[in-house]
Design a protein with these regions (language model features):
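Extracellular/periplasmic juxtamembrane segments that couple receptor/chemosensory ectodomains to their
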Residues: 2-74, 275-426, 630-706
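Amphipathic coiled-coil signal-relay and dimerization helices
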Residues: 108, 115-119, 166-172, 258-269, ...
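Flexible loop/coil segments at beta-strand boundaries within sensory signal-transduction domains
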Residues: 219-224, 307-311, 563-570, 667-671, ...
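An acidic, low-aromatic, low-complexity terminal/linker signal
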Residues: 690-887
Length: 887
């Protein structure tokens, strides 16, 4: 532990606690109250009132340290979680993107047109002939490169190199390179891997900055190298997109990608954190305080989790925020709009709140209960004091102690509320963030699908074989099938690839399990749209619906027309449809977005869903919400504008859940304003928070404090009487103070077989057993009460001075009531059965709390303990009420 301004803080907080404004505000308030407690403790010892506040003062001091520590830890955890999430997603989203690029280079290097051009150039160079004769061929290849980049817009250049590094063709005409000496060429020709991936400066790049290049050899069918193909990734463009999605306006967090040595290779704010700067990484633990540019930052560094075994180029995500701003804007105030019952239920959740956290309000309640009892007992003792001056001072002291206790409790309640809201708001932020992650993964994934179908539709062999169907149907189908199988082997996100002719009849499939579809018309509306394209950028997507091409299951089919290259008029000879393997792919996306604990385990009960604007489920990790069902959630969650998010608490299946939602916005050109395809999908992430209370169940809570005017006996005409009040349920009851010994904690009660139900048992009081009564069944209470909620025993003098105990939920005040406001019950109704002896009329000028019922110890004994009945006369003098002890 480390001491900071008089408070023992956890060592992990010592470097950051001074920057936590809520902790500092509560610390200052509680320490000022602690000084008051010190004075009151001293006055209590000097007053002779018998009220020693030392234990209460020490308990409040200990709880202050516990509470401030937990508040500090939760505020820190929330800030760290936000940084961790951003750093992790920054690197993981990039790695997912690059995983797709590793497939691109391998597939494009097998392109027949590129292979043919490379062969032609090799032969010309081998013969020493002028390559200018291949200008037309080169232009066609460069046009093919342009078509590729129009679809896969993540690339800024494509370069085809000879085995000697000579540039054979390239997309970017402004790039002056004609011959490369980059060792990348030799590595691509010799590597046993499926690709070469480099991030560094290269003579292949027009700019002097480092760039990301994917390369692989182009070979003959027998594996003889012909050339090297390079795809140049738009690294800066992509990192800007990633950082923009993770940032918010006026967010002071700086995001970066670091290389294996800790150098900054991309920054969300290059003026703040420049590219190339060395950065101190946080490699041990979730967070640390790092120094950069003479300033301290709260920071985290996260290695990638990889994707399908691919771990990327060895980069790490890094997030940091100036430490003086790291804990600002915690966002807990947004929970104020939630109904109190919702928050009360949520705060009980053992999944969200550890035993240590849930014990803090219990400790505060126990301390306040002990304080109330101490003040209550002090007032009871003062009622029998024979020294008026001392009594007057002691009463003022007790009143001040009670008031200070209330102020302290108020601060504790507010700080505990802040603590709880910090935990819940952190969960809400997490669900919102994870929903954004899920929909971003989906949009990026489906962007690739829209690209794939259009690019594969340009495969010249597919058009040629469709043209041969009439003359050699079996050979043509076999050739198309081989192409589809080769593609599907590389791209496992598809369950099936299908080629159909101009009439919409299936010609070939990649998955033999769908062989029965061959020769049959697809018969789905997307086929008609597919066969009427506007240009080579056109593609169509089916509705998310069951299809025979996916064995009757729901999926999306992406399709593009195959141009009839022999027609010469821009017509189509068929189309290609790629059947997305929706069930496992969407489930995996959602699984990756589920919240996890510190051990990496999915939080129990959490789940995630993709759904359309009509609330229909597209995918779910929870079997309770299968595909096609409608989610019973507010429409507002599905009315979000594209690219916006929300987080709230909502009841679902008898449980309150934190619900984070985000509406899709597409990725790059996909689903953009210029794209003909629009399909809004929401991602929703759910975390259970606590059970919804049963109908009519009222969350447990203490009755409100009742305050009556404190009158001097000499100041009220006819005198006054002190009444020791308490609550059974929410019923306000009392007994004349002179008949009360004290209140004690309701523990150590032993049940005794054979006694009536209203006798709860016995407990030891001053070394002798006393009976304890439960009066709830004899009071005609307005609503049922929880017997488990009894917290105090009021010890009352019975007949013959034999005491007994009454179970109560909470102690009230001991008001000094004017006798003119006290009426005997027997004046209202003649009965010997009532336990009540008097009623106190409310003082409408000072309070509106209703009637106080004063119970009679003698009647309780007579009715419930088998004693003889000796009812007081209706005209019983109030003097006797105040001063006569039952004999």
């Amino acid at each position: 532990m480390s001491i900071y301004k008089g408070i023992d803080f956890d060592d992990t907080l010592s470097a950051v606690v001074r920057h936590m404004d809520p902790v500092q505000d509560y610390r200052e308030t509680l320490q000022s109250l602690q000084a008051v407690w010190d004075n009151l403790t001293l006055l209590g010892q000097l007053s002779g009132s018998g009220t020693d506040m030392s234990e209460t003062r020490q308990a409040f001091a200990a709880l202050t340290a516990d509470l401030l520590n937990r508040l500090g830890i939760e505020i820190r955890n929330k800030a760290v979680q936000a940084l961790k999430s951003k750093a992790q997603v920054a690197v993981d989203i990039m790695v997912r993107n690059l995983f797709e690029r590793t497939a691109d280079i391998g597939f494009l290097a097998q392109d027949d047109d590129i292979r043919g051009f490379a062969r032609c150039m090799r032969d010309l160079l081998a013969r020493g002939e002028d390559t200018q004769c291949c200008t037309g061929h080169r232009q066609r290849i460069e046009q093919r490169f342009r078509e590729y980049v129009r679809k896969y817009s993540v690339y800024h250049d494509i370069i085809l190199l000879g085995t000697d590094g000579r540039v054979l063709a390239q997309l970017d005409a402004s790039n002056p390179v004609r011959q490369s000496a980059d060792p990348l060429v030799r590595e691509a020709l010799e590597t046993p891997e499926a690709y070469v991936e480099v991030f560094r400066r290269s003579d292949l790049l027009a700019e002097p900055r480092p760039g990301l290049i994917y390369a692989y050899r182009v070979t003959e069918e027998d594996g003889t190298p012909l050339a090297v193909l390079c795809l140049c990734f738009r690294f800066e463009n992509e990192t800007r997109r990633i950082f923009a999605n993770l940032g918010k306006p006026r967010d002071r967090t700086v995001l970066a990608l670091l290389d294996a040595d800790g150098g900054v290779i991309a920054s969300s704010d290059p003026y703040h954190l420049p590219v190339g700067a060395p950065m101190e990484r946080v490699l041990e633990g979730d967070w640390g305080v790092v120094l950069f540019g003479g300033r301290e930052y709260l920071a985290t560094t996260r290695p990638t989790q990889g994707y399908q075994g691919y771990m990327g180029p060895g980069w790490m995500g890094h997030a940091m925020v100036p430490i003086e701003h790291a804990f600002a804007h915690q966002g807990a105030d947004r929970l104020a709009a939630l109904p109190a019952g919702v928050m009360a239920a949520v705060m009980k959740s053992p999944t969200l709140f550890s035993e240590e956290l849930r014990n803090i309000p219990r400790q505060a309640e126990q301390i306040q209960r002990a304080l109330n009892r101490s003040v209550w007992n002090g007032n009871v003792r003062q009622s029998s004091s024979e020294v008026p001056a001392n009594t007057s001072f002691s009463k003022v002291l007790l009143w001040e102690i009670g008031n200070t206790g209330l102020k302290t409790t108020d601060v504790f309640e507010r700080s505990i509320g802040n603590l709880n809201e910090t935990v819940v708001s952190s969960i809400l932020d997490d669900t919102r963030f994870l929903a954004s992650l899920a929909i971003d993964i989906m949009d990026r994934n489906l962007y690739e699908r829209a690209n794939d179908c259009r690019w594969w539709a340009l495969n010249a062999s597919l058009a040629r074989q469709l043209g041969r169907l009439a003359e050699a149907p079996d050979e043509a189908r076999a050739a198309i099938t081989r192409v589809l199988e080769a593609i599907n082997a590389l791209y496992t996100v598809y369950d099936n690839l299908v080629v159909f002719d101009a009439a919409g009849t299936v010609v070939a499939v990649s998955n033999p399990h769908y062989g029965e579809c061959i020769g049959h018309a697809v018969g789905e509306e997307w086929v008609r749209r597919c066969l009427a394209p506007a240009d080579t950028q056109s593609y169509v997507v089916s509705a998310f619906a069951p299809t025979p091409l996916y064995h009757g299951r729901h999926t999306y089919i992406y399709a593009a027309a195959i141009a009839d290259t022999d027609a010469g008029h821009g017509g189509t000879c068929g189309g290609i449809g790629i059947v997305f393997d929706a069930e496992p792919q969407f489930r995996a996306m959602l699984q990756d977005a589920l919240p996890r604990n510190a051990r990496g385990e999915i939080m129990p009960g959490s789940f995630a869903v993709f759904a359309d604007r009509g609330r229909r489920v597209i995918a779910s990790t929870d079997a309770r919400y299968p595909i096609g069902t409608e989610l019973p959630l507010p429409e507002a969650l599905f009315q979000l504008a594209n690219g916006t998010d929300s987080a709230t608490i909502h009841a679902l299946d008898g449980c309150y859940h934190a619900v984070g939602a985000r509406m899709s916005a597409g990725y790059r050109e996909f689903k953009s304003a210029d794209d003909a395809y629009h399909n809004d999908v929401a991602a929703l992430v759910f975390v259970p928070l606590g059970a919804v209370p049963a109908a009519g169940e009222v969350p447990a809570g203490e009755p409100g404090l009742v305050r009556l005017p404190r009158l001097r006996q000499t100041g009220a005409p006819g005198g006054s009487t002190e009444i020791a009040t308490f609550f059974i349920g929410d019923e306000w009851l009392g007994i004349v103070s002179a008949h009360v010994l004290e209140a004690v904690d309701a523990t150590g009660i032993t049940s005794v077989p054979g006694l009536p139900d209203h006798v709860q048992g016995v407990f030891m009081y001053q070394d002798r057993p006393l009976l304890v009564l439960d009066l709830k069944a004899h009071l005609r209470l307005r609503r049922p009460v929880d017997a488990a909620g009894y917290r105090q025993i009021v010890v009352v003098r019975g007949r013959g001075k034999e005491p007994f105990g009454i179970l109560v939920h909470r102690l009230g005040e001991i008001p000094e009531v004017a006798n003119s406001r006290i009426d005997p019950v027997n004046l209202l109704y003649q009965s010997e059965a009532a336990l009540a002896e008097h009623v106190v009329r409310p003082d409408t000028a000072n309070d509106g709390h209703g009637i106080l019922i004063v119970l009679s110890p003698e009647r309780i004994v007579a009715r419930l303990l088998g004693g003889s009945t000796a009812l007081a006369e209706p005209a019983l003098a109030l003097r006797a009420l105040a001063g006569v002890v039952l004999e």
